[in-house]
A protein has these predicted regions:
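Proteostasis/folding factors centered on peptidyl-prolyl cis-trans isomerases
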Residues: 1-32, 84-114
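Peptidyl-prolyl cis-trans isomerase
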Residues: 38, 42-83, 114
Length: 114
């Protein structure tokens, strides 16, 4: 069993997110959860078609502060992330990209990198 994983992600915040302010723009988000879901589904299609662009898309689109690192969250262990995020990441193989992952922070797509 793996104790630690490394992942990158793209976060789309919405009005119901626990802190509905984009770390990339510094402005409050204005979209509802349905719109965020549609946005992340489009992003998932893009990154699954061209995984090499994950970091670039994260820099351009993610609402998480990790946008400046191309979405890289570094290594983390169990209990360090919100449970749905942790479960999805640990279920992926290195290089795999998740589907939609919904947490209190917003809606994510995750790529396991280590």
């Amino acid at each position: 069993m793996t104790d630690r994983v490394r992942a990158s992600h793209i976060l789309c915040k919405h009005l119901g997110s626990r802190n509905p302010v984009s770390r990339r723009t510094g402005r409050p988000v204005t979209i509802d959860k349905e719109s965020a879901l549609r946005e992340i589904q489009g992003i998932i299609t893009q990154v699954k078609n061209d995984p090499g662009k994950f970091a670039l898309i994260a820099q351009e689109r993610s609402d998480c502060g990790s946008f400046s690192r191309g979405g890289d969250l570094g290594f983390f262990g169990r209990g360090e992330m919100q449970k749905p995020f942790e479960t999805a990441t640990f279920a992926l193989k290195v290089g795999d990209i998740s589907g939609v992952v919904d947490t209190d922070s917003g809606i994510h797509v995750i790529m396991r990198t280590g």
